[in-house]
Each structure stands twice: as C-alpha cells, then as structure tokens.
A protein has these predicted regions:
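Conserved functional hotspots at enzyme active or ligand-binding sites that engage polyanionic ligands
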Residues: 2-4, 71
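Nucleic-acid-binding surface
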Residues: 16-23, 38, 52-200
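A short, conserved structural fragment
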Residues: 42-48
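Short amphipathic alpha-helical interaction segments
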Residues: 26-39
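Short amphipathic alpha-helical interface segments
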Residues: 4-19
Length: 200
C-alpha cells in the first residue's frame, strides 16, 4: 500500500513531450496507472512503448517524436539545414537518416517522416545529441549536414545546395577544415572544392 501511494504521487513533467514506458516505470507508474493516465487523456499512446504527454507546455518541436518512432534515427539533410538556419526552404516532412535495410513498423499520424538510408560510416559521423529541457533528439552537426547535402545535391536541388553552402560560409563559426575532413571521408571532396572555388 505504501509503495502504491508513493507511485501515485509521481507526476509527469510539463516540459517533456514524449515518455517511454521504461521512463514511466522508473518514475514509479505501474502499467495500471499508465492505462489510467491514458483514460484520463493525460497521455496518448503513440506506439507499443511510447506515450505523448498531453499536458506538455514547452516549445513544440516535431523532432521530439523521432526517438519514439525511429530510435536509431538522426535528423539530416534539409530538416537539419532548417534547424541550423541555413535555408528558407521548409520541408513538409522530417528527414531522418537510418541504417541500411532498417525496417520500421509504425509511424506517427501527425508527423511526416522521410527516411534516408545511410551507410554505417555516413550514419556514425558527426552525430550530436541535442537536449532541450527534458526532450532530446539526434541530429548531424552543421558541417556534416552541409557535406551530406552536397553529396545529395541532385536530390536536394542545385539551387538549394548553393543557398545552404553560401549561408554556411557566411557564418563566423564556419570550419572549412572540418568540411574537408567530412567530405574526404564521404568521397565528395572534389565537388566540395569546386563549390568553394566559386563561392569563396
């Protein structure tokens, strides 16, 4: 009875949008109590292992849903470029990099996700863990994002690629050497140099 009472006193943080079943259990919620929170419309079940906190009051960002639906996913390409303010383009879905041959069983109805299959090396380079209040997601760092876009310039669009690289080069914190290192590892150093010769 004492353990049950202690668990009932646990509350959800209004600053965390998505909870995993494991997180809820660590907070002291039983499966029965989690079901009650769903019935009370305090939680919405997203999939077998994650729930959305209806009482979330933080700044909304659809990136917070990605770990629930694509645990190994990394925000990439145009979605990452938007995050770093490198483009005025607004994609209608979130670009997420995943391992080759990765299969996913469920997607959210409210969030559009575009999967991009990356090799093991490309997926492991330049990954950042971003934490905002009690929410987190993975995204490639800004230089890796630029190099990935150059590699995928035909898919992204030549004008969009030029805009993104131009905006990156205008930043005071730009790191050309880091661009070169990524480009060399990902076999697009020649095309990067061609762009830089024109833009610098």
């Amino acid at each position: 009875m004492y353990i049950y009472s202690m668990a009932r006193e646990q509350t959800l943080s209004a600053l965390q949008l998505v909870y995993s079943s494991t997180e809820l259990q660590k907070l002291g919620f039983s499966y029965y109590q989690i079901s009650n929170l769903v019935e009370q419309n305090k939680l919405v079940r997203l999939n077998k292992s994650h729930y959305e906190n209806v009482e979330f009051v933080g700044d909304m960002n659809d990136f917070y849903y990605i770990p629930a639906f694509v645990p190994e996913g990394v925000i990439c390409l145009m979605s990452a470029a938007v995050y770093y303010n490198l483009t005025t383009f607004r994609p209608d879905s979130i670009d997420v990099a995943v391992p080759l041959k990765k299969k996913l069983s469920s997607f959210p109805q409210s969030v559009n996700i575009s999967l991009h299959y990356f090799s093991k090396e490309r997926l492991s380079l330049g990954v950042c863990d971003v934490k905002v209040q009690k929410n987190s997601f993975k995204i490639f760092d800004i230089e890796k994002t630029v190099v990935d876009i150059i590699s995928n310039r035909n898919k992204v669009g030549i004008e969009e690629t030029k805009e993104i690289l131009t905006n990156y080069l205008a930043r005071q914190d730009r790191d050309i050497n880091k661009l070169y290192r990524y480009a060399e590892k990902l076999s697009c150093l020649k095309i990067l140099k061609t762009y830089l010769e024109v833009l610098l």
